[in-house]
Amino acid sequence: MLERLLTISLEQRLLILLGALALAGAGIWAWSELKIEAYPDVADTEVAVIVKYPGRPAEEVEQQITIPIERALNAVPRVLTRRSRTIFGLAVIRLTFEEGTDDYFARQQVLEKLRDVDLPEGAELDLGPLSTPVGEIYRYVVEGDGYSLVQLRELQDWVIIPALLQVPGIADITNFGGVEKQYNVIVNPAALEKYGLTIEDVEKAIQANNSSTGGNILSMGSSQLAIRSVGRIRSIEDLQYTVLKSEGGTPVFLRDVASVELGALMPSGVLGYLDKTRGKESNDGVEGIVLMRRGENPSQVLQGVKAKIAYLNSRVLPNGVRIVGVYDRTDLVESTLATVGKTLFE
């Protein structure tokens, strides 16, 4: 049998050579498509419900947010465990499902039950990203010569994160550091009393004037004009000229009872990092953590992330601003493969 096989191989050299090349090509393709991880992902299917209720104590958050959501989620099928945590201004409810449960099925069931929950005004509900505890594959910082933390945070929120979320396989980008811009309204109590106003009146007036509304179509001959009201606040001047009330036909503006200045939202923490490769240490900055969607190929996702970052650095971000990687899962994967290969060889 072996002699006949050798004879056929010698007689059909071209066919055998082509077959060997095809087999080698298939092997190379299979290797490139192989999902190589530093450690296996053995996490159960889990859905996290995250509700922000700013400024509320833990007891109030638990009564108005956590307990109603827990009751609604009791009817979700195939759930193994339910855990919740309530802190100041935040509630997190985690559901762990039976082994083999499809991720999208689990999230759909949770969303259907959440529709029946009546949350108080001001509460923001969201589902956690479709990732796992080992889904963190890349970290970067945003640096800019001559740019403030407010400006870097704006670039992160409005340019960098939306662009990176377009990369296939990305579940979410977690934002750390920076300072969020806000308008500070410093009210003069004596002026409020003079015009017969309260803090609630000022708050309602600002909310009512910070919106745009749609109108209708006005026909003018063969043309049509779209009518709309543009009221979105875009600058300090827009805010200063917000009308609070009218006395005898004379408007009372916000600037008459308060001063308006550009400020920053009080941060809940500070980001610091040490880049040993460049010998740079920073006590503040803006960082992004890239989370991979469950079941994706980390090598391919990382290639897409790096390509997008290179594009942003060269074509999109202003001069002096750059995205610098500080953690890359590729290094860990290569180190793990080298260790495994060395062990097998020995």
Model-flagged regions — what are they?
Residues 1-345:
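Membrane-proximal extracytoplasmic
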